[in-house]
C-alpha cells in the first residue's frame, strides 16, 4: 500500500516521502480502515516538525484525522459492529496519510452518509474543537464575549459562525488587514489586527478591555492558538474569574506573563487537547456529539471550506499549499473512492 512517511523530523516539504509499505494488521481491539480522505491540519505539520505534544517515533506516517471504511477487525464488539461502516478516524497516534490505517476501535465513530467525503474527512479536529471548547468546557453564555487569536483560520471562522448561532460575541485577533472585512462578513462582532513585529501588546490589551466590558474590567472567556505576544496579551485582558484555553502554539513562542495577572483577577489559563478530551468521554457522549456536529456541519455553521484536493503522490504540493497563507481553506488528501 502507499503511505506518506518521514524518516526524521523537519520541514514537511523536505522530509515527507510517499512510499510502498506493507499493509498493517489489526490486533485485538483494533480495526483496519481503508482511508478515503484526510486533511492537512496545523497539528500534522507540527508533528512532522517535532513540535507536537506527542513526539514522533520515526519512521512514521502522519495524519490525525480522516474518514474511511472499516475493512477488518482484530476482535472485539466495537470492531464487529463497525465492519463495512464509514467512520471518522480520530487517530491520536497518527497514521491516516495512507491507503490503510490501523487504529483502536475506540478511535473510530460511524458517520452519517448525508455528509460528503470532504466534510466527513474534516469532521472532528476543527468542528469538535470549536464546539467542545465553547459549549462544553467554557460554556460561554449568550451575550458574553469570547476573545480568540488566529481568528482567520478555518477553526476561527467556525467559532465566529458558532457565536452567531448560539448567541455569544466574538473579539477576533488576526495578523493581516486583508482579513478584517472577510471576517466581518461572516458575522464577527469585532476584528483587531495584531502583528507582534509592528504592534504593541498594551494597545491590544486596552482594545479588548474597552470592547468587551463596559467598565474595562476585562473579558470573561478566551481561546488561544498562537502563544507568544498575542496569547500573552489575551491573558492580561482577562477579567475577574476569566478563563483562557490554550489549544495551539502556532507562533512556537512561549506565553509570558506575571503570576500577579492571575492572582489579582482569580483568572485561569488551561490547556485543551481534543484527543485527550475525547479519550475521557463515553461512547454515548461521542455519538451525541457526532449527531450535533453533523447537524451544524450540514447547516454550514461548522462546515469546512476545501481549497485544494491532492493525492498521496502529490504530498509536496499539498503541504506547500497548506502552509500558503493566501490559500483560504483546507488542503485535502483524497486517497480512494467510497
Give residue spans per PLM region:
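Adenosine-nucleotide cofactor-binding segment
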Residues: 164-230, 284
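Short, well-ordered loop/turn sites that connect or cap secondary structure elements
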Residues: 80-82, 140, 238
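C-terminal capping/lid region of NAD(P)-dependent oxidoreductase domains
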Residues: 216, 294-295, 301-308, 316-338
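Glycine-rich beta-strand-centered segment in the early N-terminal region that forms part
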Residues: 22-39, 51-95
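Short, glycine/polar-rich helix-capping loops at beta-to-alpha or helix-loop-helix junctions
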Residues: 96-98, 175-182, 254-259
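NAD(P)H dinucleotide-binding glycine-rich loop of Rossmann-like/cofactor-binding domains
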Residues: 87-150
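Glycine-rich phosphate-binding loop and adjacent beta-alpha segment
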Residues: 229-301, 334-338
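Glycine-rich NAD(P) Rossmann-fold beta1-alpha1 loop
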Residues: 127-128, 150-157, 228
